[in-house]
C-alpha cells in the first residue's frame, strides 16, 4: 500500500485500504465496518449525483463516518484510468450494483487483477453475478431480497406476512461482504493471488432464514408464522404483555419448565405422559397442554409489573428482557456502562449521537475519528495520493470526470 491518507492509525485493520462503490445501505455498510475497525476506506460517489443516502437528515452521519469521499466517474475515459490506478494500491474493492454491471461496462475481475493481482473483489447484488437472465440484472432492495429468499414469508403473523425491519437484508448482506472479504484477504496474504466474491442478497437471506426451512426441505413441513409475536412452535417463547409493557422470554430447560409450571399453577401436569420428567421445551402444537400453558402464562404475566416479572424469571434462570423503547436506551445502566451510545462531531462541528463502535476489540479498539465527509471532499487528496498532479486533477474536473471541494 502507498502512503496513507491523513488519518489516525488504530484498530485491527490499520494499514488496509478498502474502496467501495455503492449507494444507500448494503454495500456501504460493509465499508463502514472496515472504517470503524481502522481500515482506510474510500467511498466512491457519482460526480453529478451524490449518494442518495445524503438526503436523510441523521442516518448518514452514522453510516458514512470515518470515510474518505472520492467523487469520480469510474466508467469513462480518464476517470476510469484514475480508478484503475487507485486499484493498484487497494486491498479490498467492494461494489454494489445490479448483477454483473461492472463487467458489462468493461471493468471485469480480470481487468482489475491486471492492475493488482492481489486484489480482493466483492460483488454485492440482489441476485448474483450469474444465473437466469430474467433475474440477474434486476434491481434489489431490502424487501426484494427478503421476498425472494423465503425470509419474508416466515415473518409477520398468521394473517399476513411482513418484512423484518429496519432493512434487515441490507445489513446482513453488508456484513456478509465484510466477513467474506476478510476471509479472502487472509488467503491472499498466504498465496498472493486475488479473489472475487459473488454475494447475492437473496442467498444471504436464504441462509439467514434457514432454521425452519430445513423442516420443509427434509420433511415437507411448513412452519406457521408467529401469533402476536410468539414463537410459532414452542410455548413460553416470544413476546408477552405485562401490566406496564412488553417482555420477551424463552422458557427453555428442564428446571425452568418445572419451576414456571409451579408458579402458574400447572405443577400437576409435571411428570404426566404429556409433560414427562426431563421435558426441555413445550411444543405449542404437539403438546396437548401447549395452549393451556400459554393461556396460564398470559394471565400470570398480565397481572404483574415488568420489574416483578423480570425479578422472578431471573430467580428461575429463565432468559428474559424488557422490550425497551428507543428513549429508554440511553439511560439503561448496561448501555451507560458499555458506552453503547456515543457522540461525535460532524464535519460542520455539530454533535451527533448514535451507536458506538461494535464489537469492542480489547487490544486494538476501533474509534470514531471523523464525521461524514462532503461530496468530493477528499477527491483531490486521494488523486494526489496515487500520483496525480494538480494539472491532471484539474483536467479531470474540467471534463466532468471528477468533483473536488475547493
From Swiss-Prot:
Pfam families: CoA_transf_3. It is found in: Cytoplasm. The keyword Lyase does not apply. Keywords: Cytoplasm, Transferase. Its EC number is 2.8.3.21. One of its GO terms (cellular component) is cytoplasm. Belongs to the CoA-transferase III family. CaiB subfamily. Catalyzes the reversible transfer of the CoA moiety from gamma-butyrobetainyl-CoA to L-carnitine to generate L-carnitinyl-CoA and gamma-butyrobetaine. Is also able to catalyze the reversible transfer of the CoA moiety from gamma-butyrobetainyl-CoA or L-carnitinyl-CoA to crotonobetaine to generate crotonobetainyl-CoA. This is L-carnitine CoA-transferase.
